[in-house]
Design a protein with these regions (language model features):
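Sec-dependent signal peptide recognition
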Residues: 2-8
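Active-site-proximal helices and loops of the catalytic beta/alpha 8
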Residues: 24-38, 52-58, 62-63, 69-88, ...
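C-terminal motif of bacterial Sec signal peptides marking the signal peptidase cleavage site
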Residues: 12-15
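Bacterial signal peptide processing site
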Residues: 17-19
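Active-site cleft segment of glycoside hydrolase catalytic domains centered on the general acid/base Glu
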Residues: 176-189, 219-227
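Aromatic- and acidic-residue-enriched carbohydrate-binding clefts of CAZyme catalytic domains
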Residues: 32-36, 73-107, 138-185
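Alpha-helical scaffold elements lining the catalytic groove of polysaccharide deacetylases
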Residues: 186-198
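Boundary/entry segment of secreted carbohydrate-active catalytic domains
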Residues: 24-48, 178-188
């Protein structure tokens, strides 16, 4: 799929981010800090993830892939996506493939510079009282043969049916059941050792990071004790759905980054209604003044995720692939602006909130690659696998993010409404036009040194480094340039995409 060229630079003249106590004392686990863009290949098979690393993600500069939970999980009628979040055992077998395919994926992705981060379900087991797993294992209520029994679960006794009813009560949230999911007693030695054993098994296969699903529903001391047993010091980011102002997230900072849902909601609102000027500090109604965001070094950010794009997890109203050009523009801003660590969502098309991934026969996942693979439809006419991460604007902005990572915000400009621009010290310059009718036409200071730069969304630097594959701009000795950005478009320049003198 190809989008039309998104930018024309007309001229450049003069210038152009009480529960159980821990089984034993443990220091808080401290995660390795990592930078770079994560992509969530939601519900992809291990074989397809490996192919995508080699063909797309490695060359584009993605740092890591978040993959769906690699566990033996409940087999639910209709095969909804959320059956993957109902473990029966920690055996690596399920809809995406077996252990051998998983190990092959990790090896092949790492060979092209892409890490694998696992979506780890540690808080609970299944929400069905009895059934059969994807591997044929029979399980019952609080009975998982050879793994857990009745005493390995919280039975909170705080509500009539042990389900959470008061969502701002830590005792209920951390010991009662989340929508009937059997809540593990994570303060015990047995459960901690079992969960840490699962994570260490994944680390032994080369996994370097974990998204902790439903972390808000685990006591931070329990989670810290579990992660303290994990080898390799993996990257950790934790799902904590917090109100504004946040009152829960800080408890999880010692273990790693925390999902910043307020960012998703507020940035989405702005791209829906159009006043993107509010995305820059110091402007009237600036989003940074209107919400209590987490500190940048603790925040894990995204425009949409697999829950809130379906209205789950406090979601609804976020920008998704169904919102046309607003979605890649929002992701472009996220990748350009210095706040948090970003994750890009890669979806499949869905009509209802429980619909599972594309299948061959209602059971097996229909692959992206292979002779019978569906490929990627793109968001323009979504069907099957949407693959938002392959959009030229998104791929180009991954390179921009990598080039400017760590550089402060400089040279900000807005028209007060639907257009903005900013630099990242002496590393790059970004422009965004949310107007549906008017081009962005301005002569602006960029913070970049004089030279000829390639606009990366329209093509970037040619292979030989001697010319631009797309549009070029000449920046003058005073660091200024004249730009024209068409409606509903973005443009980006950075020093690594500069034509050799």
């Amino acid at each position: 799929m190809k989008n039309p060229v998104l930018l024309m630079v007309l001229l450049a003249l003069t210038a152009c981010q009480p529960p159980d106590p821990p089984a034993e004392s443990a220091a808080p686990a401290v995660a390795t800090e990592a930078s770079g863009v994560v992509v969530h290949l939601f519900e992809w098979t291990w074989a397809d993830v490996a192919e995508e690393c080699e063909a797309v993600l490695g060359p584009a500069g993605f740092a890591a892939v978040q993959v769906s939970p690699p566990v033996e999980h409940a087999l639910v009628e209709g095969r909804p996506w959320w059956e993957r979040y109902q473990p029966v055992s920690y055996t690596i077998t399920g809809r995406s493939g077996d252990r051998a395919a998983f190990a092959d994926m990790v090896s092949r992705c790492q060979a092209v510079g892409v890490d694998i981060y696992v979506d780890a379900v540690l808080n609970h087991m299944t929400g069905v009282y009895e059934g059969v797993s994807t591997a044929g294992t029979t399980f019952g209520e609080y009975d998982y043969p050879g793994l857990y029994g009745f005493d390995d679960f919280h039975h909170c006794g705080l509500t009539e049916n042990d389900d959470i009813e008061i969502w701002d009560d830590p005792a209920q949230v951390r010991t009662c059941e989340l929508v009937n999911l059997a809540d593990l007693r994570t303060g015990t030695e047995k459960v901690q050792a079992t969960l840490a054993g699962y994570l260490n098994d994944l680390v032994s296969l080369g996994v370097t990071g974990f998204r902790v699903d439903a972390a808000r529903h685990m006591d931070p001391a329990d989670l810290s004790a579990i992660l303290a047993r994990v080898e390799g010091n993996p990257v950790i980011y934790q799902e904590v759905l917090d109100p504004d102002p946040p009152s829960w997230s800080a408890d999880y900072y010692p273990m790693g980054r925390v999902t910043e849902f307020q960012y998703s909601y507020m940035v989405s609102d702005i791209f829906q209604e159009g006043t993107v000027a509010r995305l820059l500090p110091g402007t009237e109604g600036a989003v940074w003044d209107a919400a209590s965001f987490l500190p940048s070094e603790q925040a894990f950010v995204f425009i949409d995720n697999h829950d809130n794009q379906r209205g789950h997890g406090g979601g609804g109203g976020v920008v998704t692939y169904k919102d046309g050009r607003r979605h890649p523009l929002a992701m472009a801003f996220m990748l350009a602006y210095p706040y948090g660590r970003p994750r890009v969502m890669s979806s499949y098309a869905f009509e209802d909130d429980r619909q599972g991934p594309p299948t061959v026969d209602g059971e097996a996942i229909h692959r992206v690659y292979g002779p019978d693979g569906l490929g990627c439809s793109g968001p323009e006419a979504p069907e099957g696998w949407v693959c938002e991460h392959r959009q030229p604007m998104v791929e180009a902005m991954v390179g921009f993010h990598n080039a400017v990572d760590g550089a402060p915000l400089v040279e900000t400009w807005t028209n007060g409404r639907d257009q903005l621009a900013f630099g990242r010290a002496a590393r790059g310059f970004f422009l965004l036009n949310r107007s549906e009718t008017e081009p962005l036409v301005q002569t602006l200071p960029t913070g970049l040194s004089a030279g000829v730069y390639c606009e990366v969304v329209s093509g970037g630097l040619s292979v030989d480094g001697q010319a631009c594959a797309g549009t070029e701009v000449a920046i003058g000795a005073d660091g200024r340039a004249r730009f024209e950005v068409p409606p509903m478009s973005a443009a980006a320049f950075y020093v690594d995409a500069q034509v050799a003198p």
